[in-house]
Amino acid sequence: MAVDTMESVAVVAVPFPAQGHLNQLLHLSLLLASRGLSVHYAAPPPHVRQARARVHGWDPKALGSIEFHDLDVPAYDSPPPDLAAPSPFPNHLMPMFEAFAAAARAPLAALLQRLSATHRRVAVVFDRLNPFAATEAARLGNGEAFGLQCVAISYDLGWLDPGHRLIRDYGLQFLAPDACMSKEFVDFVLRMEEAEQGAPVAGLVMNTCRALEGEFIDVVAAQPSFQGQRFFAVGPLNPLLLDADARTTPGRRHQALEWLDKQPPASVLYVSFGTTSCLHAEQVAELAAAIKGSKQRFIWVLRDADRADIYADASGESRHAKFLSEFTEETRGIGLLITGWAPQLEILAHGATAAFMSHCGWNSTMESLSHGKPVLAWPMHSDQPWDSELLCKYLKAGLLVRPWEKHADIIPAQAIQKVIEEAMLSDSGMAVRQRAKELGEAVRASVADGGNSRKDLDDFIGYITR
């Protein structure tokens, strides 16, 4: 592709302001910029800062290849997560979601108009929770909109047709959205979709690959609601690191990586529940007892869900302060407890890591599978129960810790320990670990020369620069 053709197209990435969404669009932006495209990333100021600070797996200099833009929105409440809430969904983020949806359109429209005047084409890649971006792209004489699928494409099949043959044949269960999300958020999503209904969308870019969801990609592409859209399965968007990369991270290395360097191969359980989930104190105690009882090496990231603005003041010490002190002393030499941000990609790529106990967010699921690590599935909310179904029943690269029907219960230590020991010590666990390793190799092949994801990325770039 000629350089002038590439430079005459502006790509504008418009993420939804939550960590798993910010991260995926920044990875895609970096991929496109590495291919010579002019890429612009537009989000509220604290979320631009958050995305830049937390991205892992790239040379820090790569961020200089992207132009970042602030979408100013009015002040909003940024409370801590409500630990007494009846639902595990992070409803404390709703004031920010509402403020963003109401105010981000105007500064985005102004940015698109400026870029439209100086480029042959403006390709707007928007998180599908931001349908207003498609409407604004359509207002340009030279604009096109492409949705970014930040969840499994199979999740869309469940949303559109929960009784579909493919779901039935594999014994999968799709939960209605209001069973695992708050009513406020479901209403918000439906309201956004209804307001922007009819906005033309040229295609769908998916953070998945045929090695994981090939059957579902074909079935969803044939659904009437996607008629006329081009499908580009370009995942995984996250960088694929090697064990050597995890051992030679440039700059000052995180303590977790230095600790992993000293552990035997495939001996460590990594435990983390993402950025939008909290565990009750009673559940923390049961999980701690299970980890100790299993006598397995571990890295445990214990932190509460993000605030809407992660840079807002958080007063006081951790609510787990007493536990942290005692547990750290009791497990000294066996494991590592982290209360801040952890370099998850590098941890999963490290040869000492054997398995990942996870909330099953799609970001974490893709990162784990692309590095050949099985998942001990503990879904918390949103699409996560579906991801656990996909992992455990369809891909057979996961073991279920907590069935969704018990999501309101405290899971006892004995039940958790049993799954840890199955994953780390048993023949059946070894089979799951081997299956995850095979999937990891297939996922890596998909982004290598000649792979399906590489071809789809080439096709996407070719289409927007045509």
From Swiss-Prot:
Active site, per annotation: 21, 127
EC assignment: 2.4.1.215
Gene3D superfamilies: Glycogen Phosphorylase B
GO MF term set: cis-zeatin O-beta-D-glucosyltransferase activity
Xref: PANTHER family: CIS-ZEATIN O-GLUCOSYLTRANSFERASE 1, GLYCOSYLTRANSFERASE
GO biological process: carbohydrate derivative biosynthetic process
Name of the molecule in the record: Putative cis-zeatin O-glucosyltransferase
Pfam families: UDPGT
Reaction it catalyzes: cis-zeatin + UDP-alpha-D-glucose = O-beta-D-glucosyl-cis-zeatin + UDP + H(+)
PROSITE patterns, sorted: UDPGT
Keyword annotations from UniProtKB, A to Z: Glycosyltransferase, Transferase
Binding-site list for UDP-alpha-D-glucose: 342, 344, 359, 362-364, 367, 383-384
InterPro entries with a match to the protein in the record: UDP_glucos_trans, UDP_glycos_trans_CS
Family: Belongs to the UDP-glycosyltransferase family.
SUPFAM superfamilies noted in UniProt: UDP-Glycosyltransferase/glycogen phosphorylase (SSF53756)
Function: Utilizes UDP-glucose as the sugar donor and catalyzes the formation of O-beta-D-glucosyl-cis-zeatin from cis-zeatin. May regulate active versus storage forms of cytokinins and could have an impact on seed growth.
Ligand binding (an anthocyanidin): 21, 91
